[in-house]
Amino acid sequence: MKRKVQKIIDEAPLEENSPPRFFDSDVEADSKPNDLTAANSIVDLKTNSQHENANAAGKEYGDSGVSESWVLDFLSVTGEKTISEFLAQKIWKTSNGDLNVAVDMYFDESFNIKNSNPDSESQKDTDASLTQMDQLSNTVSVKDLSINRNTNKKALNAVSPSLNLSSNSSVQDVSIDKEEMMKKQSRNALTPLDFIMKKNELMKYIGCFGVEAYSTASGTRTLQAGERIYLERQKLSIKSQSRNSRKKSKLLSINSSCYSNIVRFCNSDHHEIGKLPTEVASVISTLMEQGFWSFEAICIYSDNIIRFGSNVTLQVYCFINVNHPSLNRSPFTLATNSMQEEEEHLKASFAQNKRDHLLRLFTWIALEPDLEDCNTKESIHIDDILKTSSLPEARDESNSDLTPSSTEDEEDVVSDQLAILYDKVKTSGAELPSAPKPSTFALDLREYQKQALYWMCCKEEGVQSDGSAPKLHPLWSRFRFPKDSEFPEFFKCSSDDDNTHFYVNLYTGETTMLFPNSMPYHRGGILADEMGLGKTIEVLSLIHSRPCFSTDEIPEAFRHSKPSLPVASRTTLVVAPMSLLDQWHSEACKVSQGTKFRSMIYYGSEKPLDLKSCVIDTSTAPLIIITSYGVLLSEFSQQSHSSGLFSVHWFRVVLDEGHNIRNRESKTAKACHSISSQNRWVITGTPIVNKLDDLYSLIKFMRYEPWCNYTYWQTFVSLPYQSKDVLKALNVVQSILEFLVLRRTKETKDRNGNSIVTLPPKTVKIEYLDFSDSERKIYDSLYTKAKSTVNANIVAGTLFRNYTTILGLLLRLRQACCDPVLLSNMTINSETFDDFEFSVEQFNSLINQFVVTGKPIPSDILKIDTLKSFEALITECPICCNEPIQNPLLLNCKHACCGDCLSEHIQYQKRRNIIPPLCHTCRQPFNEQDVYKPFFVKNNGTQSTLLVGEEVKWKYWNRLQSVKLNGLLGQLRQLTHSSEPEKVVIFSQFTTFLDIIADVLESEKMGYARFDGTMSQQMRSTALETFRNDPDVNVLIISLKAGGVGLNLTCANHVFIMDPWWSWSVEAQAIDRIHRLGQEKPVFVTRYIVRDTVEERMLKIQERKNFITGTLGMSEGKQQVQSIEDIKMLFEY
């Protein structure tokens, strides 16, 4: 039981939950070990009778000559049941009968006494160690070391020769060989922290704090008030280090520490007195690992008689060696991508631990940042930062109810928060100087584009973009060394006035004496101008301004490139979506003057056989190489560095539509992160789509330290935002955006208060349409079934369990609003129509009325294209004898009749089972699907059924067209048949609907081009070129996803959006393909919406700026609640 007491006293600091003991500590006496009194009485008894125990009369322990009573006392303290005669003799002889020394030797692993065995091979070393200790004890008695405080300095030099003590002592000097021997064989686990001013050390005092330590020794007048205290860290034994797991070994290799977190303290005679509490010891030990921190202490109060576990009040003084190399090097380092994710996490964990302990120290010494001359007057509260600390005692209890899942799913950012983030970026961009247009650049640049060029050049050259003096980096804080420092004179400390400040990154724990410039040490940035402002032109102007490395940049390029990678010194790599490759190529050719500025597409069959040789030869290397994300991913998966995109160190890499890599775990993002480049740029109008983590992947591509480390990002951005500390997270992100991002919108004002760009007016109107009777029947049948399904799931509480089914029903309803033909491949069973007024056959019959087979109208029918030739056919109806024929219809045999007459004729023959029906004139059979109806085009391009106009056209009689197709065709005829035809862009999210529109355009003989995701890059390029340059092609049908971003379609000025999307921003992006820089005509936008359908209710959801798949600014639970409300709104529940 008494051994247990000793172990508790000696090893309690290893327990992380041990509370610190400060001056105001409320630790009561009864919180000490229960058997402490018994242990103290035993030790005190032995301390006061050491010599007597060594020579006590009584029964000896075997033949060893050791007193049995001494052995019993030793066993009672150590807790051992038995001890070998050999070991007892050795311990007793070496300790000279001093029970205190014997117990310390027994529990000190460096002596390896517990494993002593006279028959083992290792015993020789143990015997030698004990023999040497025995020889020393004969020269300097342990009794003198423990009791005679006036004659023990020389002896302590023998025990620990590294201590520089005075040699004025009456004790006989110890020879050098014994001193060296003792240096190896004494307490290796203790390393003294002597405060010795070495040649290059310059110590500066920063503060002090008080702490209540506790003793592990006992004695009378061992400490005095005001006495100097020495602090010693305990080394990790080899055995302890070997027990570490693989992960801990990696962390130790990063930390390079061979010390534990135990810190002992000794008196001025270097006699160990006790230990510091766990928290204080952990802080001091962790900071000491950095090499430039030093700690000294004095005794404030100690009992005259110290016992095991007695409280000792100390004052600890903190110093920094301002000449230490680690404090005088750049606080920024270039990020590399070679570190494995596990090692990166371990390194970040160690750095965060270092930061937490540093901030804890600052709170103890009441050290606050110096706000004078800083770029912010806002106070930085260290306690607030510690709320995200890894230290258990630093966590805020108010956040203790966060579940693991709640910390994994980051909440979305609301639009108001995005506006706050971008506001400062836009403000700083308005005051930028302008750069001159490059001489090789063929186009003129607007003023805001020249400002962007200046900003980008500054980013690549590493200079301050506003020309002002460097500012303190917003993540760093300046601290002032205390001027009036009161501490004992025996602490050697510099009082020079040259070093008045030091700098600390309160988010990472890094410390430096150098000024942390706000200009980061990376090359590149994020060009985030709003869509339509000409980001492509701005980047091309940068390429012409800085086409290659400058002379002083080449050594840096080779230093920062991956091993063995050649440098492509004059080539910029542009990575873009496949749909934009041709646009980049054409724009690059258009702006370049001279053949030496050539660009090349690296895609498909156009890829050169040897890209490395192509780009490293400066005489033939292209200025720009354009490739797709797909090609980059494909070569990344091959892991080949001998050829291809990953075989060189590029001068510049540009990611167009860079938000495509916002998922850091995607393979595309990892491919982009791995490419080697000197300058890195991201082009995106939406650097943050929904979540703050969207920005992280872009920052990792930029290799912007330290935020490209995900653990840092998560600790200081993601977790605070999730814990509702939104303002602090946004402040950090804003400080990052301020230096990385340039963003302007169409409403941004220049320095004169005028808009930076003036575009033609844009008119957006919603055209509400009404279903035909057949369409209404189809839609209502689907809506009724869908609504009953939703209601049943809401009542049963299984809505989210059947979420996919609900979304499928919504999809069918939206397709029914476009055209019933989209439902032709719908799987329908009889149970679906159990509650309806018609059967499956009737439902399919309704849909078949709208099915367009795509079969063209016969050419001999199309030849009847004039009013004169048409009137020759409709003189008199052969059925009703009306003259002329009313609502004429024409059969394949070119016999005409009234429309009503033909309908009755077909029904009559069906009743008589005459199938197929026979022509009313020549009695030839005909297919009722091959009946044609004329329409007439007026001079203004409108359609009419009257016999007026200049041109006759034909269409199928019984082929119904959806209400949206009828509305679209009516407007297209006006636009394409006018004296000056205008080009039109038609957007739809359904490619099958684009197929139907294409069939109608073909039947109308309207020239059109098509652009969607199913087409190859070459087909897309051809389609865009045809639409822009062919005067006979005035219509472009395009899918919302494939053509919603990046394209330049300013040749058109009319936009038709056939179906709404859940988010208005997606439609707005599509409109900006037309209403953008370069548009010279007013833009007219028409959005088709069918009344009394889900489309009309989708507009209300758009106005609320959130929906099922992406509710902004809500937790996962709140998103589900909001989704239920949206579904109820859609189905009018």
Swiss-Prot record:
Binding positions (ATP): D529, E530, M531, G532, L533, G534, K535, T536
Q: Where is the Helicase ATP-binding domain?
A: 516-705
One GO MF term attached to the UniProt entry:
ATP binding
Known InterPro entries for this protein?
Answer: Helicase_ATP-bd (IPR014001), Helicase_C-like (IPR001650), HIRAN (IPR014905), P-loop_NTPase (IPR027417), SNF2-like_sf (IPR038718), SNF2/RAD54-like_C (IPR049730), SNF2_N (IPR000330), SNF2_RAD54_helicase_TF (IPR050628)
Catalytic EC class: hydrolase
Chain segments carrying region Disordered: 1-34, 392-413
Q: By what name is this protein known?
A: DNA repair protein rad8
